[in-house]
């Protein structure tokens, strides 16, 4: 059935088509099914998302139409809804076609939602050789990693710079200052407390960057030291707990920008950012926490006292052992963390034997890309 729009329509104008109806409400087209709104489609959204060859680059599948070429009060001149296909005619004679199922798919998440750890949580282990050689193993491991933010690879080589070999699964190393692959041992130059035998409180690295690395791999080459257990912490869970218990503290930690600095003789990085960041929907996307890199705040700034009340609460949660997951990294273990979510720490150790760790940085977007491409490859195998 085709509905012509020769006159201005109000929301009282209804077009019954099968079990669906079309309502026009201002600048939107509403599709109603079984007394509930199935889709609300702004006119400009419809025009902007036309998939025809004229509006899309056929070779690259990129959009070529730009919205400034039509009026902001654009309205359809014709609507046709046949089963699952919506066709729109525009005043300039252009026609756009849409599959309703494809539009509904846009509301689905591209990846499985993140999972809270729960009591007794321990990271999943995956074998180095299987992870690199077997796509199915890598897909399972990386999918779980995107959900929990942590995994451990065991059986890794003891050779220096073996982290370079993870690029085939994690994407390229994210280069930062202070070395491409960092050596963390007592024999190296000391510009960070990690290069001592002291305890290292929960933190994520490079809080001093405007956008810190979003994934970190910590490769234990050798661990002959006594004590020195590794610790991880789900900082998003801590932040959510504060949001529930003290929403005023949570708001302060989202709004008050804090200075962070990391430096040595040759380099310096400095950023002033809030500790907690949320997306437009209020979901936590980053917790930036580094006691050792945080710098003095101007005490005359508005809100400093409120910030310190909130920060004290946060520090108490971060150092509470009930929030910690503890384990020992042995030689050949690689701890991989989603660094904007999972903080890492270390207990003090006794250097009775050599303890040598190397770490490098990656980007979560690239890891997510690997999951997408591996899923496509898996689907192609089944289709074939």
Spans of model-derived segments:
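Motif-centric detector for short Cys/His coordination patterns
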Residues: 1-134
């Amino acid at each position: 059935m085709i509905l012509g729009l020769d006159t201005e329509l109000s929301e009282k104008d209804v077009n019954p088509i099968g079990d669906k109806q079309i309502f026009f409400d201002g600048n939107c087209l509403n599709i109603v099914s079984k007394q509930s709104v199935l889709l609300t489609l702004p006119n400009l959204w419809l025009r902007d998302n036309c998939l025809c060859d004229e509006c899309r680059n056929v070779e690259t599948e990129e959009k070529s139409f730009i919205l400034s070429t039509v009026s902001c009060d654009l309205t359809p001149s014709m609507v046709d809804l046949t089963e699952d296909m919506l066709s729109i005619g525009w005043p300039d004679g252009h026609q756009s076609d849409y599959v309703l199922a494809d539009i509904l798919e846009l509301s689905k998440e591209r990846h499985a939602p993140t999972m809270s750890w729960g009591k007794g949580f321990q990271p999943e282990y995956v074998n180095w050789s299987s992870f690199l050689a077997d796509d199915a193993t890598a897909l399972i491991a990386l999918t779980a990693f995107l959900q929990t933010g942590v995994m451990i690879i065991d059986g890794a080589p003891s050779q220096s710079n073996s982290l370079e070999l993870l690029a085939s699964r994690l994407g390229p190393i994210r280069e930062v200052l202070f070395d491409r692959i960092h050596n963390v041992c007592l024999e190296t130059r000391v510009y960070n407390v990690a290069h001592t035998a002291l305890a290292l409180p929960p933190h994520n690295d490079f809080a001093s960057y405007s956008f810190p690395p979003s994934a970190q791999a910590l490769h234990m080459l050798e661990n002959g030291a006594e004590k020195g257990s590794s610790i991880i912490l789900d900082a998003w869970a801590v932040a959510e707990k504060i949001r529930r218990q003290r929403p005023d503290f949570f708001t302060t930690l989202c709004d008050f920008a804090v200075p962070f600095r990391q430096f040595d003789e040759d380099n310096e990085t400095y950023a002033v950012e809030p500790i907690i960041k949320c997306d437009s929907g209020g979901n936590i996307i980053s917790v930036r926490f580094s006691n050792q890199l945080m710098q003095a705040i101007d005490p005359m700034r508005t809100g400093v006292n409120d910030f310190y009340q909130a920060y004290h609460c946060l520090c108490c949660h971060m150092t509470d052992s009930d929030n910690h997951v503890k384990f020992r990294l042995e030689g050949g273990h690689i701890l991989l963390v989603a660094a904007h979510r999972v903080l890492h720490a270390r207990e003090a150790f006794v250097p009775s034997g050599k303890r040598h760790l190397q770490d490098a940085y990656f980007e979560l977007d690239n890891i997510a890309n690997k999951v997408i491409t591996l899923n496509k490859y898996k689907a192609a195998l089944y289709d074939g």
